[in-house]
Regions:
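Cell-envelope/extracellular polymer assembly enzymes that use nucleotide-activated donors
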Residues: 6-8
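Catalytic donor-sugar/metal-binding loop of nucleotide-sugar-dependent glycosyltransferases
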Residues: 148, 169-172, 181-199
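Acidic helix N-cap motif at the loop->helix transition within catalytic regions
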Residues: 18-22, 44-52
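A conserved acidic beta->alpha catalytic loop
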Residues: 39-47, 92
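Short beta-strand-to-loop acidic/aromatic patch adjacent to the donor-nucleotide binding site
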Residues: 82-91
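Short, well-formed alpha-helical segments that are part of the catalytic scaffolds
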Residues: 15-29
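Short, high-confidence coil segments that cap the C-terminus of an alpha-helix
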Residues: 32, 82, 110-111, 189
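Acceptor/aglycone-binding surface of glycosyltransferases and processive sugar-polymer synthases
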Residues: 62, 68-79, 96-174, 200-226
Length: 228
């Protein structure tokens, strides 16, 4: 029998006092205890809420962006001995029960990274404007890197320790998701897409990326690809 894998859940959070408590409770319910919340200098009571739970809390002194928060969380998880790292959103869009299917291919040594894909699961009722943006992003990723992923900007991912050590996240903003895809291609990391459910509520839609932010991200990706 192989050793039990230490699974760490990394949650970047910015002004998520309204949802982070329920997110942590759901993760506990499904047996995930190694939870790392990175509070990216929230102005609300995100940190105060997190402190009521037995989880790791790291707080950035200034707001740096989701990419920076993810990098901070991954670095801490690696330092603390994680075998598998799962990145998970703080706004309640992701389901804790989906983590099992994400980590199984890694535990079985079938993949080094698994990418959650909401379009492979019919239960995800994706708003039409969001679907258009995500499909446009997928096309851009394919043209730039040759990887066809219809949901490259889904924050629900899992990676082995070895993959986490290979991945170099340089961007502080949302474009870090595209960097992960780029790193998979450049470093020939074995990956698989896994069907997951993404829940859309008024809260999560309000908190999510705005259309102008998405176009800004796409333009930065394209400029980076052209000029390196």
């Amino acid at each position: 029998m192989g050793k039990i894998q230490k699974i760490y859940i990394v949650i970047p959070a910015f002004n998520e006092a309204g949802s982070i408590g329920k997110v942590i409770e759901d993760l506990f319910y499904y047996g995930y205890e190694n939870i790392v919340v990175v509070d990216d200098a929230s102005a609300d009571k995100t940190s105060e809420t997190v402190k009521t739970f037995n989880v790791f809390l790291i707080r950035h002194p200034v707001n740096m962006g989701p990419g920076a928060a993810i990098k901070t969380g991954i670095d801490f998880a690696l330092f603390d001995g994680a075998d598998i790292i799962v990145t998970f959103d703080a706004d309640g869009q992701h389901l804790a029960k989906d983590i099992y299917n994400l980590v199984q291919p890694i535990i079985l040594n079938e993949s080094e990274i698994t990418l959650g894909n909401r379009f492979l699961n019919k239960t995800s009722k994706v708003p039409i404007f969001k679907k258009i943006i995500l499909k446009a992003g997928a096309l851009l990723m394919f043209l730039m890197y040759g990887i066809l992923s219809s949901d490259s900007h889904n924050g629900l991912k899992a990676m082995s320790r070895s993959a986490a050590l290979k991945i170099n996240i340089r961007s502080n903003g949302w474009e870090y998701c595209s960097e992960v895809i780029e790193e998979i291609m450049l470093k020939k990391i074995k990956y698989r897409e896994i069907p997951v459910t993404v829940k859309y509520t008024d809260y999560s839609i309000k908190k999510g990326q705005k259309i102008y932010n998405s176009f800004y991200i796409f333009s930065k990706m394209f400029i980076k690809w052209i000029f390196g």
